[in-house]
């Protein structure tokens, strides 16, 4: 049986660029990394729920804003990861090191600017977006938003370092850093929220301490670890270089634009979701927390696509990029189906961690049934394919598709279905499933063509620039 599995995986995944052992070896740490991130978030949300429904609602309202900042930061780092992966595929070690340093520099700069703006405008942001919310909820939301904005500055070097590790395919050490941050965050949350009853303040303090440990882990990987895959010199991080910043910017701007408008749409959905009542908002918060944990393996496959496709493109092997693009989507279907089947029998116990009220629990179950049905059927293609296109440099198409489907279906149709037609929070989740269907179709059309494979990689773009 073992010989058959090895032979099958060799036939499916092994090429002259990667062996199946390398692919699986990169995937497993990524899945574990994403699972720990989402599982710790799930457990923390359940801890916050012990402080009352106001706290859960406040965190839910702020999460899309916080997530937007985080994803803009991650978007530019993803652009950096593509650059790093392409240089890695080309075999240029010095360029890889310089690209890692520049990615971290960019991450720190962009995060600091965004976080300070949100910190000083936190009161106005909450009033504008969630003025209809209850007074107690708004007070907690303002505190949480301001605190999380400052916390993200501490997290910026760790995000850049993670992009470097993913770009070179060293997901094992990235997992170690992620485990340090997330496990310590869980224990700090346990102390400050459950034992000391510090509510929102406890969550913020836990984030601060855990992300400080993450900062120390980045220093270790970058400057102390001997023979590390991302070891760099300090000047490679402190002195900005035009050619790298230009490449990171070229790939990062479409990513970040997508995140701004995508999460802006999520915030708008949250703002009209408030009109459906606290029960609907709380049910959405719980269902979304569980759902994002289920989503973790797909995110892992998508991140793997950045490394694999990026290195194939950097090596000039566009034929392999096409092959692996298809294989990774299939891998996404296998992984998510297996994971949903494993988690499904445990859902009842997981939901009880949130101490939901009976009516909230009833609505939560409905949302999860809608979400999981669409997830297994449509999410692998709609999630993994954009990573493949971006890793090849085709960032604008994936951004355009994501924005049109998000604003047209989830925001526009979601408002009509939930508010105007009166189908409530269930209507919003049904629209999410429709969005995944449309995304899958549009990305499949692009993948079957050749335009995404004709984009210049960073080596070709650099050579063209030198000629000019």
Regions found by a protein language model. Give the residues of each.
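Short runs within selected transmembrane alpha-helices of multi-pass transporters and secretion channels
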Residues: 77, 147-166, 174-185, 203-219, ...
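Helix-terminus/linker motif at the lipid-water interface of multi-pass membrane proteins
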Residues: 38-57, 126-135, 191-198, 260-293, ...
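Small-residue-rich hydrophobic transmembrane alpha-helices
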Residues: 45, 56-116, 155-174, 270, ...
């Amino acid at each position: 049986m073992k010989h058959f599995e090895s032979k099958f995986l060799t036939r499916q995944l092994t090429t002259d660029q990667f062996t199946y052992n390398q692919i699986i070896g990169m995937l497993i740490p990524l899945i574990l990394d994403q699972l720990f991130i989402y599982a710790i978030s799930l457990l923390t949300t359940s801890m916050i729920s012990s402080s009352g429904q106001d706290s859960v609602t406040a965190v839910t309202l702020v999460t899309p804003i916080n997530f937007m900042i985080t994803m803009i930061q991650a978007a530019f780092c993803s652009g950096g990861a593509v650059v790093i992966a392409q240089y890695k595929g080309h075999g240029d070690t010095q360029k890889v090191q310089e690209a890692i340093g520049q990615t971290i520099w960019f991450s720190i700069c962009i995060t600091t600017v965004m976080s300070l703006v949100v910190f000083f405008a936190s009161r106005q942001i909450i009033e504008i977006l969630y003025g209809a919310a209850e007074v107690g909820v708004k007070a907690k939301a303002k505190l949480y938003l301001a605190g999380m904005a400052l916390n993200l500055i501490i997290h910026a070097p760790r995000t850049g370092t993670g992009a470097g590790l993913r770009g070179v395919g060293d997901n094992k050490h990235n997992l170690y850093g992620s485990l340090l941050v997330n496990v310590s965050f869980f224990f700090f949350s346990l102390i400050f929220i459950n034992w000391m009853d510090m509510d929102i303040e406890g969550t913020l303090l836990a984030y601060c301490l855990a992300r400080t440990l993450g900062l120390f882990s980045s220093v270790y990987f970058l400057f102390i670890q001997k023979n590390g895959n991302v070891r760099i010199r300090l000047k490679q991080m402190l002195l900005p270089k035009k050619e790298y910043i230009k490449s990171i910017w070229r790939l990062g701007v479409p990513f970040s634009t997508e995140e701004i408008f995508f999460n802006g749409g999520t915030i708008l959905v949250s703002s009209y979701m408030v009109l459906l009542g606290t029960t609907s908002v709380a049910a959405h918060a719980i269902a979304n927390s569980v759902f994002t944990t289920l989503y973790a393996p797909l995110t892992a496959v998508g991140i793997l696509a950045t490394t694999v496709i990026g290195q194939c493109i950097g090596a000039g092997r566009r034929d392999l990029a096409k092959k692996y693009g298809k294989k990774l989507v299939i891998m996404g279907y296998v992984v998510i189906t297996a994971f949903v089947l494993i988690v499904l029998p445990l859902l009842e116990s997981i939901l009880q961690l949130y101490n939901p009220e009976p009516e909230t629990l009833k609505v939560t179950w409905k949302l999860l049934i809608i979400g999981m049905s669409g997830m297994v059927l449509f999410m692998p293609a709609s999630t993994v394919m954009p990573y493949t296109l971006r890793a090849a440099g085709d960032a604008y198409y994936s951004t355009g598709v994501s924005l049109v489907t998000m604003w047209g279906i989830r925001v526009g149709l979601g408002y009509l279905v939930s508010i105007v037609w009166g189908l409530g929070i269930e209507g919003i989740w049904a629209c999410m499933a429709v969005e995944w269907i449309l995304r899958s179709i549009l990305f499949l059309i692009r993948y079957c063509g050749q335009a995404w494979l004709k984009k210049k990689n960073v080596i070709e773009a650099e050579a063209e620039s030198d000629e000019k």
